[in-house]
């Protein structure tokens, strides 16, 4: 993912069942925080994720692990950008750092 370039990623969310568990980088997962999981982006990378609204998230976990999905955002971010009711859909994602 090139810095500053917007791409469409198939995005889902996670939270229930994972809240309070350790993320891949050793942090405690907070389902309301502005965080996300990606398979290869370095921990600490920031992304602007847009659906109906936008939010800046920080990569602190690995995933998603369901075929075809490219980004997992926290439950809180899904609610704030309007993806929660849809569940899975393409979002516009821009790498900020």
List PLM regions with ranges.
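Secreted/periplasmic proteins
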Residues: 2-97
């Amino acid at each position: 993912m090139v810095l500053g370039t917007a791409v469409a990623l198939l995005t889902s969310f996670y939270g229930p069942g994972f809240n309070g568990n350790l993320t891949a980088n050793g942090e405690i997962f907070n389902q309301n925080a502005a965080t996300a999981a990606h398979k290869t982006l370095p921990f600490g990378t920031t992304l602007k994720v847009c659906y109906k609204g936008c939010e800046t998230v920080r990569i602190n976990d690995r995933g998603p692990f369901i075929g075809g999905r490219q980004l997992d955002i926290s439950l809180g971010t899904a609610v704030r950008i309007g993806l929660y009711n849809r569940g899975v859909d393409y979002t516009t994602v821009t790498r900020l750092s």
